């Protein structure tokens, strides 16, 4: 459903079309007025689309105000068990692109940042954690069925996706290779808590 939402811009009220699915007024107000994007659900096509929509909306507003070259930081607040790797990587790509454009995209784990939520979290310019937050990594999983050739092709795609995830982890953290190898070899969920996450270069500061 479309809603026309007034947004304050240099003392004037302007009309901005905001697409809302259900009752998202809290998320909308956080995003538009406080530059805080809340992801408090699974990583799905819908939740990623919503986050991307708000990021583009903020970029549009910055251009209208003439501050796109020196924008205020944007905060992404995470409490998610993870979800779709493919959808999550789209958001990761946009965050990285915006950082290259000069944006500061901070991430804060307010609860759980697990699986794909973990990957989104570590791409932040500055990464913060609430004291009782938790982080979790595990191997990529999928539900597959069909002919042998189809399964082989799907597995190859999965391995490529897994490598992308590994490269992101190595780029943004100090998680040792042996821990990542343990993750794959033993199919273990790897849990981290704030203090350990700081040591591993996952978290910059515990709030």
Predicted regions and their residues:
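Terminal-region recognition feature
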Residues: 1-207
